[in-house]
UniProtKB/Swiss-Prot annotation:
InterPro entries: Ankyrin_rpt, Ankyrin_rpt-contain_sf. It comes from the Bacteria. The keyword Transmembrane does not apply. Gene3D superfamilies: Ankyrin repeat-containing domain. Residues 1-14 have a biased composition (Polar residues). Keywords: ANK repeat. Residues 1-32 are annotated as: Disordered. The keyword Nucleotide-binding does not apply. This is Putative ankyrin repeat protein RF_1081. ANK repeats lie at residues 67-135.
Length: 214
């Protein structure tokens, strides 16, 4: 049973948002392309022979080139654990991608057709901060969840992320001690300051003429 629907546009149109005047058919074709890629890759992944692995790796690279970010979202949404792992090996950066609606790949996994715990844990182990990401409506992945087991996992990661942020040490800024002036310069400055204060020079200065003699 599907836990919660995510609009197809949010994942499949991730890499190609329609521009002004673009026909809706372009989006539909993009959606079909990503889904067919996932289905084909899932079949190829079953072949564990040397040739089969080589064919899969080659096909995966092509699919990622065509849909660098949407592919991971689609695999996560449909519970393709092994594909998620393989995609991350080749395209690690796609884990931080978002849809036009602001959905992270964790949103897609939690709200997907098969929100397998294993996929959610894989994503969180790779990028714990995903648990705090908000979509365009300000909702975190836990807001899309309907499973008590998954909710516990998400809440635990949320606490860990918050705790890490609170105990993060302040950035160390080394303090440079002030440079000391040579002793001769210090003495000279002190003498000048004292002379100005007293109103006459100390060196070679006689008593003022109007002073009383005893």
């Amino acid at each position: 049973m599907r836990k919660q629907q995510i609009p197809t546009l949010s994942t499949s149109a991730l890499d190609k948002s329609p521009g002004p005047g673009s026909p809706d058919s372009d989006i539909e074709m993009k959606s079909t392309s990503v889904k067919s890629d996932i289905d084909e890759l899932a079949k190829l992944l079953k072949d564990k022979t040397k040739d089969g692995i080589a064919i899969f790796n080659s096909a995966l690279k092509v699919c990622i080139e065509n849909n660098p970010n949407a592919l991971l979202h689609e695999a996560a949404e449909h519970g393709k654990k092994k594909l998620v792992v393989e995609i991350l090996k080749v395209n690690r950066d796609s884990i931080n991608s978002t849809t036009p609606q602001g959905l992270s790949v964790l949103h897609s996994a939690v709200a997907g057709v098969n929100n397998k715990k294993e996929i959610i844990e894989i994503l969180l182990n790779e990028e714990p901060i995903l648990v705090t990401k908000k979509d365009a409506l300000g909702l975190t992945p836990s807001c899309y969840n309907t499973s008590t087991e998954i909710l516990k996992i998400l809440q635990e990661y949320e606490r860990n992320v918050i705790d890490q942020a609170l105990i993060k040490p302040a950035k160390y800024v080394p303090i440079t001690p002030p440079k000391c002036l040579p002793i001769e310069v210090v003495q000279s400055n002190l003498e000048k300051a004292f002379e100005e204060y007293m109103g006459y020079k100390l060196v070679g200065q006689t008593n003022p003429t109007n002073s009383d003699e005893f």
